[in-house]
Amino acid sequence: MASQSQGIQQLLQAEKRAAEKVADARKRKARRLKQAKEEAQMEVDQYRREREQEFQSKQQAAMGSQGNLSAEVEQATRRQVQGMQSSQQRNRERVLAQLLGMVCDVRPQVHPNYRIAA
């Protein structure tokens, strides 16, 4: 009987050691998975940063030329508006005088297509 209880004790101890080894293996596996996940996330972040930087440089190159065109168009528009304003200032009095002259100096006359009914 003592040998049986000793055998049972050995089996229980062996089972306990096996359970500990399995638990340790699970912990190691969980750590490896966590580490692999962190490494993968770091790679993804690095790739994302590289692609974002590449996109920004291409966008800057494309928008840089458009920015110059936009500035040129805006400057040309300003020059035209200034030219129109100065022309308006120069011709304002003359146009007003012409307009008032046409309105106030009425010369009544018969229309050339008018036929007197006889």
Swiss-Prot record:
Gene3D superfamilies: 1.20.5.2950. This is V-type proton ATPase subunit G 2. Residues 56-69, 78-89 have a biased composition (Polar residues). It is found in: Melanosome; Cytoplasmic vesicle, Clathrin-coated vesicle membrane. GO terms for molecular function: ATP hydrolysis activity; proton-transporting ATPase activity, rotational mechanism. Expressed in brain (at protein level). Residues 35-55 have a biased composition (Basic and acidic residues). Subunit of the V1 complex of vacuolar(H+)-ATPase (V-ATPase), a multisubunit enzyme composed of a peripheral complex (V1) that hydrolyzes ATP and a membrane integral complex (V0) that translocates protons. V-ATPase is responsible for acidifying and maintaining the pH of intracellular compartments and in some cell types, is targeted to the plasma membrane, where it is responsible for acidifying the extracellular environment. Residues 25-90 are annotated as: Disordered. Keywords: Coiled coil, Cytoplasmic vesicle, Hydrogen ion transport, Ion transport, Membrane, Transport. PANTHER family: V-TYPE PROTON ATPASE SUBUNIT G 2, VACUOLAR ATP SYNTHASE SUBUNIT G. One of its GO terms (biological process) is pH reduction. Belongs to the V-ATPase G subunit family. It holds the Pfam family V-ATPase_G. GO terms for cellular component: clathrin-coated vesicle membrane; melanosome; synaptic vesicle membrane; vacuolar proton-transporting V-type ATPase, V1 domain. Residues 8-57 form a coiled coil. The keyword Coiled coil applies. V-ATPase is a heteromultimeric enzyme made up of two complexes: the ATP-hydrolytic V1 complex and the proton translocation V0 complex. The V1 complex consists of three catalytic AB heterodimers that form a heterohexamer, three peripheral stalks each consisting of EG heterodimers, one central rotor including subunits D and F, and the regulatory subunits C and H. The proton translocation complex V0 consists of the proton transport subunit a, a ring of proteolipid subunits c9c'', rotary subunit d, subunits e and f, and the accessory subunits ATP6AP1/Ac45 and ATP6AP2/PRR. The gene is ATP6V1G2. It is a peripheral membrane protein. InterPro entries: V-ATPase_G.
